[in-house]
């Protein structure tokens, strides 16, 4: 989300250790010089470092699930204008705001030529993942402690044969839901989180 705290706390460490990463930039608060967000100059510094991939993350960072599709389209178009003006390119990676989406919303966002789209559900990417709803590990003040980061680095993806439900968005008709997983190999001692 391009928070200033990331720039002040994480960026110096990642730069020193030469660890590549993606930062998803929502543009409205940057344009408004919000004190908790990085500036465009700081984002350009990240871009120019060679370690950072800039990803799209909307203009407003609103809950797209609650918006009409024409509003979502306008929001993403505004962010594209900002990216072109400030960074001279439009990102080809995108992260759903709040990680929330639906199949219809994914289909709309795909029309903006994003190669890969991320949710916010934690997990390791496997070959069976939908490239328009990939898991990612968020790192922030609540979920960025060194012990958790080490666990993330040791995580491995399951090689799933199939899973249910296919529905991404839960509502009153499908919640609670039953989760069914089929693995290619025999798996023991699984933890779900």
Question: Predicted regions span which residues?
Answer:
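Short helices/loops that flank or line small-molecule/ion binding pockets
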Residues: 106-108
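Glycine-centered structural positions embedded in regular secondary structure
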Residues: 55, 117, 181-183
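Acidic, His- and aromatic-enriched active-site or binding-groove loops in soluble protein domains
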Residues: 114-123
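Terminal accessory/targeting
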Residues: 4-41, 50, 111, 127-128, ...
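Conserved NTP-handling cores and scaffolds of large molecular machines
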Residues: 93-96, 121, 141
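Short Gly/Pro-enriched loop/turn and capping motifs at secondary-structure junctions
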Residues: 99-101, 123-124, 186-187
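Metal-dependent polysaccharide deacetylase catalytic core of the NodB/CE4 family, i.e.
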Residues: 3-104, 115, 128-135
């Amino acid at each position: 989300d391009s928070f200033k705290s990331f720039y002040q706390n994480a960026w110096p460490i990642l730069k020193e250790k030469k660890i590549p990463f993606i930062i998803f930039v929502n543009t409205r608060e940057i344009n408004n010089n919000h004190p908790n967000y990085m500036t465009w100059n700081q984002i350009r510094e990240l871009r120019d470092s060679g370690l950072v991939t800039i990803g799209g993350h909307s203009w407003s960072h609103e809950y797209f699930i609650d918006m009409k599709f024409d509003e979502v389209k306008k929001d993403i178009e505004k962010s594209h204008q900002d990216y072109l003006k400030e960074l001279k390119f439009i990102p080809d990676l995108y992260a759903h705001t709040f990680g929330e989406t639906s199949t219809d919303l994914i289909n709309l966002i795909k029309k903006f030529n994003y190669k890969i789209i991320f949710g916010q559900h934690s997990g390791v990417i496997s070959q069976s993942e939908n490239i328009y709803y990939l898991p990612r590990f968020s790192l922030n003040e609540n979920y960025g402690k060194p012990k958790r980061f080490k666990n993330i680095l040791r995580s491995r993806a399951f090689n799933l044969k199939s899973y249910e439900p296919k529905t991404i968005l839960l509502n009153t008709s499908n919640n609670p839901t039953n989760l069914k997983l089929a693995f290619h190999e025999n798996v023991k001692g699984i933890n779900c989180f």
